[in-house]
Amino acid sequence: MFKLWCCPPYTFDVEKDYWNKYRKIQIMGRKLYLPKELTSQSYVEDEQWKVTEEFLRPYKEELEEDILKLEQKYSGSISLSSGACLHCKKAECTRVSGEPCRFQDKMRYSIESLGGNVGKTVTKYLNQELQWVEEGKLPEYFMLIYGLLIL
C-alpha cells in the first residue's frame, strides 16, 4: 500500500507531464545549520526523525509559501517541494484509503520523487554538498532544495 500522494508510483508520465513539458527549472536552496546542542547528541531512530521534523518544518513551511508565490509570478509554472508533503501526516493521507488528495491545490512533488538527482544538482549548480542523517547522529546542516518548472 502506498502512503503519500506526493510519492511514486504515479498515474502520470513523469517525463512527459513534468520534465519535458517545461523549458527550464529554477533551483533554490537553503542551507540550515543545526544548533550544536542538536548535533552533539546521540539519538534513537524515532527520536532522530522527530527532532529533524521539528527543526525543518518551520523552514519548509516558509519556503513553500515563497515558492507558491513564485508560481503566481510565472504563468503555467509549477513548483517542486523539498521532500514530502507537509499538509498530511502519513497516517492521514487519503492515498492510503484510495481517495483523492485533500490538498490538491497545495501538494507538490519533490525533485527526487520525479527522478531528479538532488545531490548532483546541488553540487553542480549550487556548489554545495549535501549532508545526510546517520544512524544516531544529525548532520551539521540540512539543505532544503526547491524547484520551479517554467513553461
Language model segments and positions:
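Catalytic cores of enzyme domains
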Residues: M1-L151
